[in-house]
From Swiss-Prot:
Organism taxonomic ancestry: Bacteria, Pseudomonadati, Pseudomonadota, Betaproteobacteria, Burkholderiales
Principal localisation: cytoplasm
CDD domains in alphabetical order: Obg (cd01898)
Entry cofactors: Mg(2+)
Subunit organization: Monomer.
Protein name: GTPase Obg
Database matches in Gene3D superfamilies: GTP1/OBG domain, P-loop containing nucleotide triphosphate hydrolases
Gene from which this protein is expressed: obg
Family that this chain belongs to: Belongs to the TRAFAC class OBG-HflX-like GTPase superfamily. OBG GTPase family.
Species annotation: Delftia acidovorans (strain DSM 14801 / SPH-1)
Any one GO MF annotation of this record: GTP binding
Binding site for GTP: 166-173, 191-195, 213-216, 284-287, 315-317
Domain named Obg: residues: 1-159
Length: 371
């Protein structure tokens, strides 16, 4: 399930330092000659593709990024130090374009790829540069060049890690609004969500996952009822499904267990692979159930539903139980990412060997027949 994540940033590379006008002062030497150094170059702004990131959410809260300017030149032939570079880490697949013209400038397609998105200005020349046979005591210098300044648009096609599954009005939109930066339409009638909504859940610094709120399913979705084919197809590439169930429906004639079974039936009819995907049960609207009845109602639901997988009891409205759920989700998603990445290749030259440092299993050290 792909969405487009966008962010806008303003970047400034550092200006170059100014050149210096200075003359050498030595004892018994009245005219020591020029010794003014050049200014240092300004800091560059780099972008690097980081495989551990999957969204642009950090750049929504941090729009401006400035590198430092180079130091000015000094006397005694001292050149100014270069400004500090800054490196912006972005997910693999990020498209960087000019925010005003829309021109695509860079694409980060491979992990570890580095591009210079703004170059620092060159340092100005000190008067040492202008010394000649004719001009023995130059007083010229040049200012540093300005660094590049750009307004950029970052765009990323995001693959949702987690999909929310459930009947209309089960509280999926309320949940995604409670745990992420998404603001879906929320109301007390079914089919509030008419299009998939994307939310980025930040667990900690540089720890996040993407959750997708799919429009509520109805019976017959596997045959296409209620745009069922389109919505079910969105769930196929997620790593985890959360089956959200309204534990306290307003209509007493509605049986949550029957509704949950209907959803599972639609999954099974549509695609066996989707049905076998990791799925967790999330019992929502816990705040509507009296405290003394909660344990019994949850136990009864799980028993009648014949559920043997993970169960989470939450209230999306009050956020009760949400913190534990999102941290558990992140752990699962992170583990899946590590598995998909595969084992890292290890250079055998750097493998530590116990004992005297000789690997006796190496065929080079096998005993010869003459021995």
């Amino acid at each position: 399930m792909k969405f487009v994540d966008e962010a806008y940033i303003d970047i400034s590379a550092g200006d170059g330092g100014n050149g210096c006008v200075s003359f050498r002062h030595e004892k018994y030497k009245e005219f020591g000659g020029p010794d003014g150094g050049d200014g240092g170059r300004g800091g560059h702004v780099y972008a690097v593709a980081d495989v551990n990131l999957n969204t642009l959410v950090d750049y929504r809260f941090s729009r401006r990024h400035d590198a430092t300017r180079g130091e000015h030149g000094k006397g005694s032939d001292m050149f100014g130090a270069a400004g500090n570079d800054i490196t912006l880490r972005m997910p693999v697949g990020t498209i960087i374009s000019d925010a005003e013209t829309g021109e695509v400038l860079y694409e980060l397609l491979t992990a570890g790829e580095v591009v210079t998105i703004a170059k620092g200005g060159d340092g100005g020349y000190g008067n040492l540069r202008f010394k000649s046979a004719i001009n023995r005591a130059p007083r010229q210098k040049t200012p540093g060049w300005p660094g590049e300044r750009k307004n950029l648009k970052l765009e990323l096609k995001v693959l949702a890690d987690v999909g929310l599954l459930g009947m209309p009005n089960a509280g999926k939109s309320t949940f995604i609004a409670a745990v992420s930066n998404a603001r879906p339409k929320i109301a007390d009638y079914p089919f509030t969500t008419l299009h998939p909504n994307l939310g980025v859940v930040r667990v900690a610094a540089e720890q996040s996952f993407v959750v997708a709120d799919i429009p509520g399913l109805i019976e017959g979705a596997s045959e296409g009822a209620g745009l069922g084919h389109q919505f079910l197809r969105h769930l196929q590439r997620t790593r985890l499904l959360l089956h959200v169930v309204d534990l306290a429906p307003f209509d007493d004639s509605v049986d949550p267990v029957a509704q949950a079974k209907a959803i599972v039936g639609e999954l099974q009819k549509y695609d066996a692979e989707l049905y076998n995907k990791p799925r967790w049960l999330v019992l929502n609207k816990l705040d509507m159930v009296p405290a003394e009845e909660r344990a019994a109602r949850v136990k009864d639901f799980v028993k009648r539903f014949k559920w043997k997988g993970p169960v989470f009891e939450i209230s999306a409205l009050t956020r009760e139980g949400c913190e534990v759920l999102i941290r558990t989700i992140y752990k699962h998603v992170h583990e899946q990412q590590q598995i998909e990445a595969g084992p890292k290749e290890i250079d055998p030259r750097f493998v530590e060997v116990e004992g005297d440092g000789v690997d006796l299993t190496d065929p080079r050290f096998a005993p010869r027949d003459s021995e």
